Amino acid sequence: MENKEKTHSIENFIGIYDNYISKDECNKAIEVFENQDKFNKTLDRIQFEDSPILVKQDKQYFAGPQNIKVWWQNLKSLIINFDVAFKHYAKHTGASDCYPDFHFTELKIQKTLKTEGYHTWHIEHGKGWGMEPRSFVFSV
């Protein structure tokens, strides 16, 4: 597999980090999701949020400490490369000055409607488990 040059740009606080996450790493994330979906380890938002079918039809898989043996080997390089890009972004936008200690608690892989792809990460910032305002949103 060819190693493509990693490039980045930040404009109006929107960061683009090309080739930090490889196609192979994306495919591994999709494979983890699909395998866990087969074992009914994903969440259907229609059921757990009682959402109307026309509003939310996505499914989610949460990779965290409780199931690390399932996903770590497949997603380790994706997480490392993501962290490199995120640290660069936080440093160059001033985010690390405002929020010096970021901790990743879970990885959320979300499968959306057909043609809408997969949503790999978002970070919530706030206290407690309630719905807090989002600080950063990432799509891979």
What are the residue ranges of the model-derived segments?
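Fe(II)/2-oxoglutarate oxygenase catalytic core
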Residues: M1-V140
